[in-house]
């Protein structure tokens, strides 16, 4: 079966990690043609250009895999074959009002076009239920997968990391990726008077007095492992939350907003849900006094291995090819 996988994102996000893993697994049995119409250094004003590029996608495949954007343009492009939608999350409530209005219209178009898809893939029970409740059928839940062995660390490696970035002497609280929508501003305001190392990571998209580290993946994992608490206080409905899952695999307690599919992950691993920033300081104190919460998280997170992910995707391909 020949597969065409339409991509829009250029930057690496949690969903790109998931997508690349699925592609690598399917490519072991099927030809996978990746078609990327994304724009480097994408800005919201360029979205019409992305949609225009999507409309020009053409070709015949046995199966096309599409995200939200490619479902929008599905009736207008020049493709032939069956279609699978992979939807991580849908929430534009954090956007400026004008964008919310525009995306509200596009969402209605999306839901109408989605009925033409042969299958829908989601990554959490929250989003599976979301589509089923709207009357969609053939909705599949295929969870994230992680290489658990890559989350092994020795004490010397951790100590070196702390010394390198001067993160010793007091507990580390990881606030999250340095984006406003990740809740780092509100989290910092709640915790800034505590005797803690407050750390963000990734490109600094908001100015905070907290330390910001732009790290490669291994050092990012060392940050999660070194932290006493990891926060995932996203302000939008997540598909899952890769950072929370990675922190749990590091055995580090997690406090999250629980929005969208994140709640299933946090509650499954008996982590702490904080749905109001006013209570965050109290929750951090609780996590600092109960580090054993991290081991409960690990026990749950370690169940999401590669074998189940591989079997789920290959089973779906078999169903669609029959």
Give, region by region, the residue ranges found by the protein language model.
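Membrane-proximal helix-turn-helix segments that form the acceptor-binding/catalytic region
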Residues: 101-120
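Acidic anion/phosphate-binding donor-loop and adjacent secondary structure
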Residues: 146-163, 168
